[in-house]
């Protein structure tokens, strides 16, 4: 009797900590009623609250950066030789990267959009891979491939060509991580063009070059422009792959992100000033992009 009574007491205590199914359903129905009432009274707040949280997450760090960077030495840092060299190198290498992406990426994007061949999906996967790779992995891969003792770099070194820790290495690292953005955007732009337009151009006697230059290129212009600007901005902010493959040599491989990293270790004021300069350049570029897109739509 003692064991049986203890079991009854145990199960009775355990059952007290649990709500019966009817009580649980009652709580859920009350919660649903509250949600419905909240939606009826303030239906927009369901969208405003999470949106405001995310916008605050975007705005507050930039605001804090601007506030902390404003001091008496701001213009001295912004007009310093280090800032000028880093900005000039960033603009030059990013522009070269964008040009290489357009020149070599446009034909590749057109092939992927219009041609049908084996292993096409694998090639698309290979092109998109640098977009999702961690920058450190990209830099290490470039160093293993094109370093002096790398798989292909050792062969280049026999001909007197050494890529690591040069300006060419900066451009190569930027192309590796940024050019896939252009190829992806251009491929989507070419894919969205109606194939009947190509057939009509063929009927009118247009050759392959005329078809591409006079039909495909103008119709995909918005996607090509968007991809080019994405490539430029991604190259401008490239850090991880560049520091592993090209290093951080002032005037040679020290782009703006490199100078910010070095300034963070030595002088926070320089890092803050260079960060603001990069933010201003990025904002100007985004405004230019919006204006070009608006003209294209008009």
Segments the model singles out, each with a brief description of its role:
Residues 133-139:
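Transmembrane alpha-helices and adjacent helix-loop boundaries
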Residues 33-34, 38-43, 75, 81, ...:
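Interhelical loop and adjacent transmembrane-helix boundary motif
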Residues 30-37, 84, 139-175, 246-249:
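Membrane-interfacial helix termini and adjacent extracytoplasmic/periplasmic loops
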Residues 129, 196-204, 271:
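Short hydrophobic faces within alpha-helices
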Residues 49-53, 129, 176-190, 194, ...:
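Transmembrane alpha-helices
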Residues 38, 75-77, 96-127, 140, ...:
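Transmembrane-helix boundary motif in ABC transporter permease subunits
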Residues 31-45, 64-99, 111-120, 262-268:
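Periplasmic/extracellular loop-to-transmembrane helix junction in inner-membrane transport proteins
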Residues 2-50, 117, 288-298:
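Transmembrane alpha-helical segments of polytopic membrane transport and secretion proteins
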